[in-house]
């Protein structure tokens, strides 16, 4: 389909870092900060996926409307 592999590795990397930070903060007793880190990581990934979907829709629109 042409999805760049770097994007998959970026998402996996952010997930690993968020999981690591969440575990450390949770063990330190900072559960509120751990939840915030998880939420911010999720929002960051959500925006990454939204830009990818936006690019996909632009390509589909260009194909069906014959626009460059």
From Swiss-Prot:
InterPro entries: Spore_III_AC (IPR009570), Spore_III_AC/AD (IPR025664)
GO annotation, cellular component aspect: plasma membrane
Keywords: Cell membrane, Membrane, Sporulation, Transmembrane, Transmembrane helix
GO biological process, one term: sporulation resulting in formation of a cellular spore
Signal peptide extent: none
Subcellular location: Cell membrane
Transmembrane annotation, as ranges: 5-25, 33-53
Membrane-topology annotation of the record: Multi-pass membrane protein
Main subcellular localisation: membrane
NCBIfam families: spore_III_AC (TIGR02848)
Protein name as annotated: Stage III sporulation protein AC
Gene source species: Bacillus subtilis (strain 168)
